[in-house]
Design a protein with these regions (language model features):
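Repeat-based scaffolding regions
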Residues: 1-199
Length: 199
């Protein structure tokens, strides 16, 4: 049986006027049960969950909206919603990574790198070297001529005892520095390269 949208919206407004968020959410939920692609109503539910302090539920609701936007190719809208989630739950690395991916889709390289770097730092704090290295690798591939990223990745590989991969990254960084005529920096990186690849 079809839901009468105007009646449901009217009932939700009445509950809101009384400050009864749970009942208003229940009314809006009826609309999305009938039409799961009703993004505006999902956003309204997320907003109400936020107002009542249910940040985990709100984040999950917003995540659903952001994924819908991303699937539809509305990357800017997805970015806005992912940022909303991070305001509620700043430590959500899964959301930070999706935000960085959206920046990549929008070709906003510096924003993507900054967001990836924050995630890499968080993984390092958790002692999760594997995920940290994966993110640094992604950053190096995203902006191959970014010398600080390459060197940071090389140092992380060195720390993880991945000597040959570290040497390759130091070599790439040294080559870029040499091309730019930055001789002092080149010599420092070349020294690190020789440490990893003697002879």
């Amino acid at each position: 049986m079809s839901v009468d949208r105007s009646k449901v919206l009217s009932a939700a407004q009445k509950h809101l006027a009384k400050g009864n968020y749970d009942r208003a959410i229940a009314e809006y939920q009826r609309l999305v049960d009938e039409d799961p692609a009703d993004v505006r109503t999902w956003l309204k539910i997320g907003d109400l969950q936020t107002r009542k302090g249910a940040h985990k539920e709100a984040s999950d609701t917003y995540r659903r909206v952001a994924e819908h936007y991303a699937e539809q190719g509305f990357f800017l809208k997805a970015v806005a919603v992912y940022k909303q989630i991070l305001k509620l739950q700043p430590n959500r690395l899964d959301v930070s990574l999706r935000l960085a991916e959206m920046y990549e889709q929008l070709q906003l390289v510096s924003d993507a790198l900054q967001t990836y770097e924050q995630a890499a730092i968080a993984y390092a704090r958790q002692g999760d070297a594997e995920n940290m290295l994966g993110i640094l690798d992604r950053m190096a591939k995203l902006d191959p001529e970014n010398i600080p990223v390459r060197i940071k990745y090389a140092e992380a590989l060195s720390k993880a005892k991945e000597t040959e991969r570290a040497a390759s990254e130091f070599e790439a960084g040294a080559r870029l520095l040499e091309e730019q005529g930055r001789i002092d920096d080149y010599l420092k990186v070349a020294e690190r390269l020789l440490y990893h690849r003697p002879g």
